[in-house]
């Protein structure tokens, strides 16, 4: 994708195991939480990871992918053959309106790929929305996170100042 950087090295399965078996239990223990309802939110590559992880575990009831890297070669085919866990009830997707305007391939397919993901999620019977925001990939992260959490926790769409 970028000339000066190497290809992405994988490792999602190793991280997923570490996250589910170490990070979550340790964090919940320290916070005094017992069997909480969990939402998994990611931005960019971690946004793609959030959806990927939700195909393998019933640990989350909601998934948010903010500018998820669904352009990643092979992801859409993988997702089509690995549905989300039945535990997932809601999925929130968002993009910055400038993201699909790049000339760089395959990044310029991000809107089409995200719409494909939205369609698959809905075919699985999940509640899902795609929210467009002003700006590009990492713009207005705080507001986009708030929009995601409001939707996942309430099922109600909330549009902030930078939503379209």
Indicate residue ranges for each PLM-predicted region.
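Non-catalytic cap/lid and distal C-terminal segments of serine-dependent acyl enzymes
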Residues: 1-164
């Amino acid at each position: 994708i970028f000339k000066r950087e190497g290809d992405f090295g994988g490792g999602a399965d190793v991280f997923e195991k570490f996250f589910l078996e170490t990070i979550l239990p340790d964090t919940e223990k320290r916070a005094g939480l017992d069997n909480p309802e969990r939402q998994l939110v990611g931005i960019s590559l971690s946004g793609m990871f959030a959806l990927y992880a939700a195909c393998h575990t019933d640990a989350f009831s909601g998934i948010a992918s903010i500018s998820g890297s669904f352009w990643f070669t092979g992801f859409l085919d993988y997702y089509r053959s690995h549905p989300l866990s039945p535990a997932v009830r809601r999925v929130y997707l968002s993009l910055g309106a400038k993201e699909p305007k790049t000339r760089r391939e395959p990044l310029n397919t991000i809107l089409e790929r995200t719409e494909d993901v939205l369609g698959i999620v809905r075919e699985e019977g999940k509640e899902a929305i795609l929210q467009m925001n002003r700006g590009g990939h990492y713009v207005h992260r705080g507001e986009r996170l708030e929009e995601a959490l409001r939707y996942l926790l309430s099922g109600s769409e909330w549009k902030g100042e930078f939503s379209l």
